[in-house]
Each structure stands twice: as structure tokens, then as C-alpha cells.
Amino acid sequence: MSAKIIDGKTIAQQVRNEVAAVVQQRLAAGKRAPGLAVVLVGENPASQIYVASKRKACEEVGFVSRSYDLPMATSEAELLALIDSLNEDTEIDGILIQLPLPNGIDNVKVLERIHPDKDVDGFHPYNVGRLCQRAPKLRACTPRGIMTLLERYDIPTYGLNAVVVGASNIVGRPMSLELLLAGCTTTVTHRFTKNLRHHIENADLLVVAVGKPGFIPGEWIKPGAIVIDVGINRLESGKVVGDVAFDVAAERAGWITPVPGGVGPMTVATLIQNTLQACEEYHDISQN
């Protein structure tokens, strides 16, 4: 295996330790701990696992963690009313609504109801627009986490041909904006892209987020490329794999993220970072 491993687990722990140290400094200075409200509607098992990891991370760094586990029958109006009250709550710096929401609740309306300065997921049109305008505030967690990995490993991005596979609002689209901001020539591919292989073979930096195990054959990877695999797919055997065929890709790439232990841990660590940022940049002024 020639590729160097980008260890997201280690970097995520570094980020958490840094945030925990700032929380301790805040408390020593007589300031309050940052607060995160996590809202889960219904009982989706995958969502319950994600929510538990976010709450645990909050407690580890010394945040105030508030949990709102709402029944599946919760109406859109009830959820919007909860968001309104959390927007006004001076102990809460971040509001996280775990997606997907049940049928009958409008995702867009719900995410837009969160005040932009408490939008620690970075999904609000205001925050996406700030990134578009090259003046980011709160940034989407997974793309920001990927940029943190590249920075911590001193991997330069200026002038690289970057290819993003997948154009979701959560990863692909904000990722393309992050890469533009980082000086890359950026291509976004999606289900209508013709000759996907051609784009990937020319990618100096490849970010794949489609949710299909082994979707990108290792043979397509450009020798020496940086491969960021966002996919987390559980096979019937129980094994967790990414969207890139890892073994062959790792023989060709210069750098690669493993699955698990690559991008995944960074998403939660960045949520924690964003919550601290929201507290210090937006809410300290009015609080202290």
C-alpha cells in the first residue's frame, strides 16, 4: 500500500481536546459553557445512533447538551414552535435537527426556521450563501471537517483539479464551494454525468459522497491523488466500507481516508467546533 492514511479519528480527537480546553478557559473566566440542542423526531435507528454520538461528544467537551426526542406523530407546527423557543433561548448556541424528518414535515421550512447564528449544521441558505460569497460563517460540518483534515496534514490544495462525486445539499454542493475557496479547479459530478471515469482519472483531489459501497473502482484513481471517501456503507456481512474500492485505490493514491475512521469522526467534531464558534462569535456579546 503506497498511500498515506488520513486518520480522521486522531484529528477529530485533537479538535475535541482543543474545544474542551477553550470551554475550561471560558468557565474559569466566569463565562457560560456553550449549549447545543439536539432534536430527534421519530425512532429511526440510524438517526438514534447519530444523535447519541453527538450528545456524547457534547458532554465530553463540557457543553450544555439538551435533548428533545419527539414522537413520530409530531406535527410540523409543533416542531416549528420548538425551534422558535430554542431560537430565543439564551443558553442555547446551536440547534441541530436530525434528518431525515418524517413525511409531512417540510425539511426546507424547518431548516430555514433555525436562526442562522444557531445553524451549527451549516444548512441555512444564509450560511450557504456566505460560503458562496467567500465570507463563510457557520459551515456545513462534513465539508468543513474534510478541509480541516487537509489543513492538519499540510496537504496543499491551490491549483489542484478537484472532483466531487455526488451533488447533495449536505456534502457535495457545499464541498464544491469549500474547494473553490481553497483554490481548486472544481468539477461536481452526479447521476447525469457522462463518462464519470474520465473525470476521476484526471482528479488530483477526489471527494466521493454517494452512499454506494465500492462505487468508484480503485483502477480509476489517478496515481498520487488525494482520495476523500465520505461513504459509510454497511454490508450484509456487517463490514463497514466506503464508496471507493479501498484496497486498489490505496495502492495508487498519495493520500486516502479509511472507512471507518476517516471522514466520519470529523463530522461530529466539526459540529462541536461550530457550536463553540456560534457561542463566541454571536452570543457572547449579548450574554456577558
Curated annotation (Swiss-Prot):
Keyword terms, alphabetized: Amino-acid biosynthesis, Histidine biosynthesis, Hydrolase, Methionine biosynthesis, Multifunctional enzyme, NADP, One-carbon metabolism, Oxidoreductase, Purine biosynthesis
Gene3D superfamilies found in the cross-reference section: Leucine Dehydrogenase, chain A, domain 1 (3.40.50.10860), NAD(P)-binding Rossmann-like Domain (3.40.50.720)
Catalytic activity field: (6R)-5,10-methylene-5,6,7,8-tetrahydrofolate + NADP(+) = (6R)-5,10-methenyltetrahydrofolate + NADPH; (6R)-5,10-methenyltetrahydrofolate + H2O = (6R)-10-formyltetrahydrofolate + H(+)
EC number(s) on file: 1.5.1.5, 3.5.4.9
This protein's record includes keyword Oxidoreductase: yes
Encoding gene per record: folD
PROSITE patterns: THF_DHG_CYH_1, THF_DHG_CYH_2
Function per UniProt: Catalyzes the oxidation of 5,10-methylenetetrahydrofolate to 5,10-methenyltetrahydrofolate and then the hydrolysis of 5,10-methenyltetrahydrofolate to 10-formyltetrahydrofolate.
Domain of life, per lineage: Bacteria
Designated name of the protein: Bifunctional protein FolD
Organism per entry: Yersinia pestis
Pfam families linked to this entry: THF_DHG_CYH, THF_DHG_CYH_C
Subunit: Homodimer.
Residues that coordinate or bind NADP(+): 166-168, 232
The family this protein is said to belong to: Belongs to the tetrahydrofolate dehydrogenase/cyclohydrolase family.
